[in-house]
Structures are given as structure tokens and as C-alpha cells.
Regions:
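Alpha-helical substrate-recognition element adjacent to the catalytic core
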Residues: 1-13, 17
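Conserved acidic, metal-coordinating active-site core of Asp-based
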Residues: 13-15, 19, 23-138, 147, ...
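Asp-based, Mg2+/Mn2+-dependent phosphohydrolase catalytic module
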Residues: 150, 155-167
């Protein structure tokens, strides 16, 4: 059951795709239960193998989507620096349009503005009427930082990235 849904405008999704392709990065989004992307690559194979999802290839992403997606993911399997450079180069454009973070070193995700694990956790706390003092969050990656910061008790996994250990 979906408790709350936020989505990226299709124009923003298309722009992320255009910018990713210009920079030579693989990028994908989702239509219901399918991955939607422009080309078949090793990154797509990697993701399909782990997610067991089906995929659709299309020339123009906005032509394939009949509703706004919840996220867009750029994937690079060999050089996470390339994704970091992309994120930095597009930060000014993305400001106020979407939120970006790494869910692992290979995945740079773009989601609706003000949408992250922290806002999701806060939504649940309010919906379920849980006292803030009863909240605990555990994480290991960059995308977990807002959740850990929003909880009363935040725990970083031993194998977590350095930034989460500082949060």
C-alpha cells in the first residue's frame, strides 16, 4: 500500500536524461514496474540482474511515460568519480527542481525536491503518531544521512561511508 507519493515532472526527467547522455552516463527511470531507458548497456544488465525487473527501450523518455516517475538513476560501474562530477556540474540546474544523492557508489539518484529518507521517516512518524524520542534510524550510505539526522537515535553501520559516520 502506498502511503504517500511524490514524483518528478516529466520535463525534469527528460532534462536529466538529456544531460546524462551528453555527459556519457547511463540513465534510467521507471514506468509502473518496468525500467525505461534509451539504450541497452552493461549498466542496464547489471540492474536487471539484481532487480529482476523488465525494461523498455525508447528514443525519447517523455514519449514513453504516461505518468510522472518517482526517480531517475544514473549508473556507472567503473568510475564513481564520473557520477560525482555529473552531480556537481548539474547542482545549480537541479536546485529547486529535484534532489540528488548516492544510494551506493554506482547509483546517483534524482528524486522530487524535498524527498529523501529523512522526509519519509518524518512522514511516517507523524502518520503513525510516534513520539520523536521513539525513533531510531540505521544506515550506511549517503542516501541514509537525512534519515539518521531526522531520528532521535541515528546509527551508522561500521561498513558505512565516512560521511554517514559523521552524521
Amino acid at each position: 500500500r502506498v502511503l504517500h507519493k511524490s514524483s518528478l515532472p516529466i520535463e525534469v526527467t527528460q532534462e536529466i536524461f538529456d544531460r546524462a547522455h551528453k555527459s556519457g552516463n547511463y540513465v534510467q527511470t521507471y514506468k509502473t514496474v518496468d525500467i525505461v531507458t534509451k539504450r541497452h548497456t552493461k549498466e542496464l544488465d547489471y540492474y536487471v540482474e539484481r532487480s529482476h525487473m523488465t525494461y523498455k527501450l525508447t528514443r525519447r523518455i517523455s514519449d514513453c511515460l504516461d505518468s510522472e516517475p518517482q526517480k531517475v538513476i544514473l549508473i556507472h560501474l567503473e568510475d564513481d568519480g564520473k557520477l560525482k562530477r555529473f552531480q556537481k556540474a548539474n547542482a545549480a540546474w537541479a536546485k529547486g527542481k529535484c534532489n540528488s544523492f548516492f544510494s551506493c557508489k554506482e547509483y546517483l539518484e534524482y528524486c522530487p525536491v524535498d524527498t529523501d529518507k529523512g522526509t519519509g521517516a518524518q512522514y511516517l512518524v507523524k502518520l503513525l503518531n510516534i513520539p520523536h524520542t521513539s525513533t531510531v534510524a540505521i544506515g550506511d550510505e549517503q542516501n541514509d544521512i537525512p534519515m539518521i539526522q531526522s531520528a532521535h537515535i541515528g546509527i551508522a553501520m561500521k561498513n558505512g561511508i565516512d560521511d554517514i559516520k559523521k552524521a
